[in-house]
């Protein structure tokens, strides 16, 4: 019994340490912020006038010159009413030497019609994927990002 508890405790500490290490690796290589924008008209993306949706805009700035691109395989909002259906991977390219900033967006949908969501600032997203480097092997990452502001305000 005690051995089983020690094993579970050890595994829990190992997975927690591994996740923190992946977040540090990501933060060392790239700086990323997330903005959001709701659709202007109901049904603009889906055709269903009762569905509210919008986009998350990922703004990335590389800190490591050897970073070629970021491949995002999974986006999970930490809000019960939001859903991201990622039908294909997201690639944030940094191919040119002078290009240190790049943006990419993904659509989200509000699942619950009774929920009124007006402001997503301070919300969080879990993302996971791979960092691809020029002369190193790819490094997987999982991190949590905070939603900073509306997309229009971030551009001004």
Regions found by a protein language model. Name each.
Residues 19-93:
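N-terminal topogenic membrane-targeting module
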Residues 7-9, 14-15, 57, 107, ...:
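Intrinsic disorder/low-structure terminal segments
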Residues 85-117:
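Intrinsically disordered, low-complexity Pro/Gly/Ser/Thr-rich segments with frequent PxxP/GP/PP motifs
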Residues 56-58, 70-75, 104-110, 125-131, ...:
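Hydrophobic beta-strand residues in large extracellular and virion-surface proteins
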Residues 112-154:
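Terminal connector regions
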Residues 1-31:
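A eukaryote-biased signal for short, well-structured alpha-helical docking elements
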Residues 48-52, 66, 98-104, 119-123:
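Solvent-exposed loop and beta-edge segments used for protein-protein assembly and interaction
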């Amino acid at each position: 019994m005690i051995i089983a508890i020690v094993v579970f405790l050890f595994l829990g500490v190992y997975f927690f340490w591994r996740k923190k290490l992946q977040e540090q690796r990501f933060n060392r290589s790239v700086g990323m912020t997330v903005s959001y924008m709701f659709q202007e008209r109901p049904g603009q993306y889906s055709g269903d006038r009762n569905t509210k949706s919008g986009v998350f805009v990922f703004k990335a700035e590389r800190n490591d010159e050897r970073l070629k691109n970021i491949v995002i395989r999974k986006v999970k909002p930490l809000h019960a009413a939001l859903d991201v259906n990622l039908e294909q991977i997201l690639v944030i390219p940094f191919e040119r030497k002078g290009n240190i900033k790049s943006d990419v967006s993904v659509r989200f949908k509000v699942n619950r019609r009774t929920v009124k969501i007006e402001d997503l600032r301070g919300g969080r997203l879990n993302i996971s994927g791979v960092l691809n480097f020029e002369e190193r092997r790819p490094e997987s990452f999982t991190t949590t990002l905070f939603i900073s502001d509306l997309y229009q305000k971030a551009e001004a």
